[in-house]
Structures are given as C-alpha cells and as structure tokens.
C-alpha cells in the first residue's frame, strides 16, 4: 500500500542533541537518519511501493510526490529548510488532499508522521485542534479519521520520559484513537542517539514493512515467492471472540478450475506473487535491488537462467485459461491467476477469498471439490459445451457491456453519421445498418430522447429520395421500412427490447447480409 512520510520541519526540530563525539546533531538530523534507513529498506524489499514526502510547520508542502525512486526521496531529506511553529492539523489535511487526489478513497495507505512531540502553541496547535473538534461544522471538520483506509504511525524524536512530562503523549494517543485505533506511537528508548533512532525505526519496519515470503507448492513442485503487498490479518466480525486470521507461509495449490466457472468472485484483497530466485549458496538473487546497476543486471541474468515453478505456473494458467485454487489456512482459500498489464506484459496474481468452507456459493464447499477423473462421465461434456456448476444468467449485466454515452454532442453526431454512411451502402451493409440503428433506438428510448428518433427517421426518408438511379432497388425499401419503424418507436407504445429487423423483399439476394 502507498506510504506518505510526513516530516516536521518546525523550529523545535532544530534543538541540539547531546551525542558522544565532536559533531553536533539536531533532532531533525536524527529524523533524517531514521528515514534514510527506512527508505533504504523499502528500496531493497518494497521497490514496487509508492512513497511521498510531505514537510510541515504552520503550513505543509509536498516535497516529493508519489514515486518509486528512493534516491529522490533521500536527496529531499538533505534539502529541507527550517520553518516556524508546529501545526499538525494542517499536515493531516495535506495528507488527505494528496492521497485522495492520487489514489481516491478506497486504497489503503500508511502515514508515517515524524515529529519531536511538540504540539505547537496557540491557535493551530494540536491542543487547540483537539479541544475544538466537536465545535466545528462539517466543512471544517478535523481530518481524522482519514477518508480512506489507513494506519498512522507516529515516530517521536523524544523518549518516553520527555513526552510524559507534558500532555504530548496523551494528545498523540488521541490521534490514533481518532483514526479508529489504526496505528501506533513509537518513542526512543533511552537517550537520543543514532543507535536508538535506528532501533525505533527498526521496530516500525518489523511491524509494517517486512516483506511476506512464502513457499508456493503444487505436489512435488515448489517455489519461494514474495507476496506483495503484505497480506493483512483478517478478523471475522461474526465470531464472539474474534481472532485475526493470518495466511500460512506455505501456500499449497489444491486444484485448478476454468476461469468461466469461477467468474468474477468477491475477494478481500489482491496481491502480486513474485518469484525469489536463490543461487547455489542459498542467497537471494531475484529479490530486491543492488547499489550498482551492473551487479543488478548480472543478478537478474543469473536468476533468469534458473528454472522456476512460479514461471511455469504463470505461463500454464495464461495459456490454458484457468485459475489455481490455493489453500491459505484452515478453511481459507484463494486463487492464483494471470492478469494482463498490457498486450505484452502479465503478472501472476493471488486473490484472497473470505475465510469459510463455502466462500463462493456456486462452487459449493471447497472440501468437496474433486478431480474430473473421479466422475463417471466428463462433467464438462465431450465437447466442453456444458459446466457442472450453476449457469450464469443469460441477461448481460449493465456493467459488463458497452453502453451508449452521449455526454458531448460529438458522440451523438458520430452515431448518426455512422447510420447514414451504412444507409448509403445498402444492401451490402444491411446487417451493420440495422445493428447501429437498434443501438441508437435503445439509447434514445432509455434517455427519453424521442425527438431524435423522429429526426433520424426524416433523415432516412431524405436519403431514400436522394438515391441514384443505379442504386439497388432493395435500398429504397429498407430505408423506408427503417424510417417507419423509428417513427413507431417514438410513440408511447414502443417496446424497448424489440429490435428492428430487415424487410424481406423479392430483391434480397445472396449478397444481402441477414440478421
């Protein structure tokens, strides 16, 4: 999931820190050191993740928009200036704006807030914001909870004793509570020094940025993979004492099924499945990135020459048009499938079903599915013309078909011109002419645009009078017939599902296309 790093650059972050040695450090230097450690870890293990950098004092500024270039993020850390007082609310408002603008309100996001625990003074301070949050209108509401799924991690450049001497810790804990309890506060254990800052950011990495490695198994075949993004624990609301369910690190394929049978099932989340190549010494080759481009290229070349079950599975699913059912845990399944990014690129994906013995009702209980060879006769038929599972409804779903949209006048003009072009090529274009005519008729009836039907009918009658002497006799009959049917469709007795069919005449030959 995307990450927004929010860095405090107020004057309080310039307070000096007594560190052993001659070099003088400020709290912002400790924060930059910790963030550098985080960015280096993400560049190695989370290189597909998008990260943005925001700085704030009384105002906020987007230093680096969402990017996968962690060198740019690290350069921005060394180019930050010092500003005035702390105003956390403005920073949180900025986070809301940039996340919603880039990702909308449905994509989960992690927010890493780096501050020294100073809440600001006067109007705009966190104390003032929390004290007045219940006295505001909807237009000026406090930005927490975020309007998107999120986790808020507060990294304090202060130890616990320093925060407890004031009400800073209590106010910061209130932020986590306002975000529906999603998040955590981290403080420095012991004196402020580089080592303890590394330890604090290490705890954040262990909690939120540890890559999920698993073993993908199918019979005797196995492959080490990374699942990205990391699957989150799932809590079943119906249970009296809900316990978060975590997927196993052993992902076992239990069977294969046609894409048409599984259709488009409801899923909890979707993840990339990336192979991890190991060399003979057991070190990872295909995961992460190296500092030197030549070393990276040579490592990728070595990884590409090693046979990998993950690659075999991906290619097989893509060619055969099937998905693999995978066991995630006790009574918990998912599916592996090939998803195309473009015409030339596709990825192996894994979607997680809801836990339970029967996540997809039309398949029945997962434990009762078996191989085709166990059936007395092929449940798909000899010609693969039937399915053992309940058939999908014949009516097309509204979201699964191309609909006619006339937002701009040019769209309507294009559809009318298409009908007229086909009308001039009758009878060769009879089938296409009536197809476009029926599409326009249904759209006009759906929108209540009856005047359009009358106007197109008049155009067709005019086209009939302009036919040259060399025109096929059937063209005039078809145009007159189509115009009459459109006029009937503009009355209150019109039937939406009725299609206008070609008029059968004695002039209709084998060259005329039939509906």
Swiss-Prot record:
Pfam families: IntS14_b-barrel (PF19435), IntS14_C (PF20504), VWA_2 (PF13519). Residues 2-204 form the VWFA domain. Component of the Integrator complex, composed of core subunits INTS1, INTS2, INTS3, INTS4, INTS5, INTS6, INTS7, INTS8, INTS9/RC74, INTS10, INTS11/CPSF3L, INTS12, INTS13, INTS14 and INTS15. The core complex associates with protein phosphatase 2A subunits PPP2CA and PPP2R1A, to form the Integrator-PP2A (INTAC) complex. INTS14 is part of the tail subcomplex, composed of INTS10, INTS13, INTS14 and INTS15. Component of the integrator complex, a multiprotein complex that terminates RNA polymerase II (Pol II) transcription in the promoter-proximal region of genes. Keywords: Acetylation, Magnesium, Metal-binding, Nucleus. The modification N6-acetyllysine is found at residue 418. This is Integrator complex subunit 14. It comes from Rattus norvegicus (Rat). InterPro entries: INTS14, IntS14_b-barrel, IntS14_C, VWF_A, vWFA_dom_sf. Its main location: nucleus. Belongs to the Integrator subunit 14 family. Gene3D superfamilies: von Willebrand factor, type A domain. Disulfide bonds: none annotated. PANTHER family: INTEGRATOR COMPLEX SUBUNIT 14, PTHR13532. GO terms for cellular component: INTAC complex; integrator complex; nucleus. Mg(2+) binds at residues 10, 12, 86. It is found in: Nucleus. GO terms for biological process: RNA polymerase II transcription initiation surveillance; snRNA 3'-end processing.
